[in-house]
Amino acid sequence: MEIAALIFDFDGLMVDTESPTLTSWQMVYTDYALELRLEDWAPALGTNNGFDPHAHMVKLLNERDPYQAVLVAAARDEILARRDVLKHELSADLGLLPGVAELLEAAAAEGMPCAVASSSNRSWVEGWLGRLAVRHYFRAVLTADDVRVTKPAPDLFLLAAARLDLPPAACLVLEDSPNGIHAARAAGCPVVAVPGVVTGQLPIPPADLHLTSLADIDLLRLRTLRTKAWFQ
């Protein structure tokens, strides 16, 4: 089936928000002489229903100092607030990753509809799209607020395809995380894997195409993804 629409992930695909998200938690862990390892963080990438970094911190502290663990557990709201401040400070100067703007402009010129399907909440995604002045490129923006379960479940991509009034097989998904790639495949969408700074350190599952950057591809080649032999 010919590709008729593009569905973009957000975090790590359009903007490298995953680096400050991880780094901000690592900074909080350092406050308690703890280490947050990438292999522990990995299940959280591309979803909102995996790893709880605060609960993990309490668990690690309990092995060393049960009393301190109790205090940290009780201070959850304060710790999350500090982490949010750090995350926003680290994210302040971020922009679109290479190739994103060009692909959006090409899709608009061709009349190809685009959507965003993200496991983050709506205020986060819409805030970024507005700040980066790209919201108008998207016919639909689907977030964790729109589904009962996020990636790796297929719900976000199925809903995005429905909002675009297209079958999933006609919607090409652009994803950076293993959870997102699994979700796209479960939805029946063709998927291009574009690992980011953080997800590039993880094993990436099979996809229809693997890229190091969206700057390495153009819209014409994406549209013919399922028919051009050089994509195999």
For each of these PLM feature ranges, what is it?
Residues M1-I3, E105-A108, N121-Q232:
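Asp-based, Mg2+/Mn2+-dependent phosphohydrolase catalytic module
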Residues L90-G95, S119, A187-G188:
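Short, flexible loop segments at the rims of nucleotide/cofactor-binding pockets, characterized by
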Residues M14, L96, C114-A117, V149, ...:
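Conserved SAM-binding loop
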Residues G12-L13, E89-S91, M112, V116, ...:
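Short, contiguous strand/loop micro-motifs
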Residues E35, P113, P190:
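Residue-level detector of anion-binding/catalytic polar loops
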Residues E2-A101, E105-E110:
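N-terminal helical cap/lid subdomain that shapes the substrate entry/recognition surface
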